[in-house]
């Protein structure tokens, strides 16, 4: 749920939005695209996992099946998968930040610790689930695909301080 939707829900419930600590996590857009590609490969190369993709919409299934290469996925406009820029989940209509803290997946444990400290709960070690082994995300890109992602996610890159290769 987007923060603006939550804010509206709080208002309907007569809860004070300002009394709560709100946070979101974002991910490097280039790394995120590689993750989507690697997920596609796992699904399409594993009949058991392919059976479990029933939760996907038909449009997503068809898009995933149509990708023959990482470059193809990027060039096709990342069609049919969840590709909304992340800033839409963090900022409101007037570019005001709707959450109190934005963590980065690249710093997950450290940023989670900040959240624990802020809300007054003991720090905990997060489990590392769904880890995949693949090359560093920068090795998937050429100049063209790097630029396509940079243009699509320009505001994410700007607002959250991302740069290719960092």
Which functions belong to the PLM regions below?
Residues 1-166:
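Membrane-interface amphipathic segments in extracytoplasmic regions
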């Amino acid at each position: 749920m987007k923060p603006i939707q939550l804010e509206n829900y709080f208002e309907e419930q007569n809860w004070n939005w300002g009394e709560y600590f709100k946070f979101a996590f974002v991910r490097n857009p280039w790394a995120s695209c590689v993750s989507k590609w690697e997920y596609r490969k796992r699904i399409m190369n594993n009949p058991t996992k392919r059976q479990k993709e029933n939760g996907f919409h038909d449009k997503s299934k068809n898009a995933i099946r149509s990708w023959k290469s990482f470059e193809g996925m990027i060039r096709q406009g990342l069609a049919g998968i969840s590709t909304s820029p992340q800033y839409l989940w963090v900022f409101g209509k007037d570019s005001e930040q709707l959450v109190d803290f934005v963590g980065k997946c690249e710093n997950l444990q450290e940023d989670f610790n900040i959240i624990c400290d802020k809300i007054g709960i003991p720090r905990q070690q997060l489990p590392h689930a769904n880890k995949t082994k693949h090359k560093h995300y920068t090795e998937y890109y050429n100049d063209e695909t790097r630029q396509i992602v940079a243009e699509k996610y320009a505001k994410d890159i700007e607002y959250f301080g991302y740069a290719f290769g960092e």
